[in-house]
Amino acid sequence: DDRLMLGAMGSSKVYMTKFDKYSDLFAEQGDMDTPAVFGVGLGYKLTPKLTTALDITYTMYEDVKSIGNAPPTIGPGQIYPISQAANATGKDDGLGFGWENQTVFKFGLAYDMSDKVVLRTGWNYGKSPIPSDNGALLFNILAPATTQNHFTMGATYRTNPTTEWSFMYMYAFGYYQS
């Protein structure tokens, strides 16, 4: 069936140059690699002008020490014990943001209004990778990524067979984690 489209993608961990200015903050003396991401996608042409798509991706945050290592261990009512060796930043197995691996679901629609104009909309959901326990929220003030739902819309305008202009808008819904 030529209306059905399947795809798969993958990106291995990208080893980045260390952040020298943050060597005392990020685990492994400033190392902040980009995690591996894998995914599958399905598209289906519902009509000659309307296509729907579903993507599922999996990001391996736990394999990057500065992102996946455990955050500070503190109990209720305790003050952050920065002086304890177990809570040291910048060390080989130093503190991380404590992020868990994340599965993200994306759903989208594309409508071909004409040979020149395509309209798009989509929804993205990924449970926050930040655990709500044991000091992770406090430590993640440095990297706030708690939005779970995103809505997108966009359009492409083809001015000629070799040139097109694309525009998009994204709205990230508020998400409060405690």
Question: Would you name each region that the model predicts?
Answer:
Residues 1-178:
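Outer-membrane beta-barrel porins/channels
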